[in-house]
A protein has these predicted regions:
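Extracytoplasmic cell-surface/polysaccharide-interacting catalytic and binding patches
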Residues: 2-97, 101-224
Length: 224
């Protein structure tokens, strides 16, 4: 996506907040939660086939186009979204989730890919667990990556505490920053705080985030 920040009115569709019941179970699926896809690790074809019944389709909050997210990841995101709004006064929205291999090819061919975009078949967006999020600061929704890299972003946005608050509570909902700073040698992807990854449980997410690990490092600790 070429846009890096978005207006708060005309361009961002109205967010529909959903509060799940407390007893809704988020099933843990290690084969899915710990799957790594990257430049040397393609998405298994059997994974894509098995994922299809577990995709939730919803409007993209930026332009209203249909997007998809793995259902457990989406349920966890709605809880995160609700609490951010009602406890902290912070609005967040999704603007990308699951991508097919064809979607990834189109991004590259259309010139909309960024330097963090993987090749078709080698993007963790194919898992449905990697979410691109934007945060409302003032009149606009911003990608945090844009805040860090675009000189035109106002200073008051760069100094907003909304992004830090988001980072602090992500693990409570089973999310991590997928491509953290200083972990490029492990992930193969440049730092991108706008992409969060569902890992199935808050315990795992805290083990990763609290110890300044990336997903690759954490998984290596599970291997004898």
């Amino acid at each position: 996506m070429s846009c890096i920040f978005f207006t708060g009115g005309a361009e961002v569709a109205e967010t529909v907040y959903f509060l799940p019941k407390d007893n809704v179970d988020i099933a843990k699926n290690p084969d899915r939660d710990y799957l790594i896809v990257g430049f040397s690790q393609p998405i298994p074809e059997e994974y894509i086939e098995a994922l299809q019944p577990d995709l939730v389709y919803l409007p993209n909050y930026v332009d209203g186009d249909t997007m998809a997210v793995e259902k457990a990841a989406y349920l966890a995101f709605t809880r995160l979204q609700w609490d951010l709004r009602n406890k902290y006064g912070i609005n967040v929205a999704l603007y990308d989730g699951y991508r097919t291999v064809a979607d990834q090819q189109w991004l590259i061919e259309s010139g909309l890919a960024t330097y963090t975009t993987g090749q078709p078949g080698y993007s963790e967006h194919h898992t449905g667990l990697l979410l691109d999020i934007i945060v409302e600061v003032g009149e606009y929704y911003y990608s945090e990556l844009a805040v860090l890299t675009d000189e035109s972003v106002p200073e008051e946005v760069k100094s907003s505490t909304a992004f830090n608050t988001l980072h602090e509570i992500l693990p409570d909902y089973g999310f991590i920053i997928r491509y953290p700073k200083g972990k490029e040698s492990y992930t193969g992807i440049a730092y991108n705080p706008s992409e969060i990854r569902f890992v199935g449980s808050k315990e795992v997410a805290h083990a990763i985030m609290d110890n300044n690990l990336c997903l690759e490092e954490y998984i290596s600790t599970l291997t004898p």
